[in-house]
Design a protein with these regions (language model features):
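Basic, flexible linker segments flanking DNA-binding modules
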Residues: 1-12, 76, 89-95, 162-171
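Mobile-element integrase/transposase regions
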Residues: 1-30, 38, 54, 62
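C-terminal domain-tail junction helix/linker
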Residues: 2, 98-100, 122-174
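Residues immediately flanking
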Residues: 8, 34, 46, 74
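Active-site beta-loop-alpha junctions of metal-dependent nucleic acid enzymes
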Residues: 24-25, 41-65, 69
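Buried hydrophobic side chains on well-structured beta-strands
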Residues: 37, 70-73
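Short small-residue beta-strand/loop micro-motif enriched in glycine and branched aliphatics
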Residues: 37-42, 103-105, 129
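RNase H-like two-metal-ion nuclease catalytic core shared by retroviral integrases
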Residues: 73-74, 82-85, 89-95, 101-125, ...
Length: 174
């Protein structure tokens, strides 16, 4: 219960109500605890290094612990490419400050971040298919309610416990 997978997904444009700016994009940041499958979600108008740092700080508050490891893909919100040699990415600075190991998966291998990728497919099926919103605040409010439900859905991989129940079970052993 100390390893996270983090990723970002686009919020489908079909969710935005007609009177809203269609050029506007929204992004869902997702953090999943690998042991419990408990998730934290938060939405932004951009996927940037600064928002990544903000998201990790929010996730630490949500989970109430600092992970030992975080695994991400190689998106610019998580790491710099070779053109930034010599510069330290803001996420890596935060990880260093908090003594978190940052693992980056090999390029073009999203299956290596499979838990968070699968959770994004579930979000499309369970949430975005039925969602409509006009503002970022409305998206965040509806998303928070969805997150509460999501962490209370039994999962076969957890022996039909919910992510919240699995976390309680693991914490009772420590």
């Amino acid at each position: 219960m100390k390893s996270w997978q983090i990723d970002v997904k686009y919020v489908p444009q079909t969710c935005i109500l007609n009177d809203f700016d269609y050029d506007k994009k929204f992004y869902q940041y997702t953090c999943i605890d690998e042991a419990t499958r408990q998730r934290y979600l938060y939405w932004y108008e951009e996927h940037t290094p600064a928002n990544t740092v903000d998201f990790i700080k929010r996730a630490i508050k949500f989970f109430n612990y600092i992970p030992k490891e975080i695994q991400t893909d190689n998106g610019t919100e998580f790491t710099f490419n070779r053109s930034y040699i010599g510069k330290v990415h803001p996420m890596d600075k935060l990880c260093h400050q908090l003594n978190i190991i940052h693992h980056k998966i090999r390029p073009r291998t999203p299956q290596h971040n499979g838990k968070v990728e699968r959770s994004h497919r579930n979000d499309n099926e369970r949430f975005y298919t039925y969602l409509s919103f006009s503002t970022l605040d409305e998206l965040r409010a509806k998303g928070s309610a969805y997150l509460l439900r999501s962490n209370n859905i039994p999962m076969s991989v957890l022996g039909y416990l919910t992510p919240n129940e699995m976390r309680q079970k693991i914490e009772s052993y420590t």
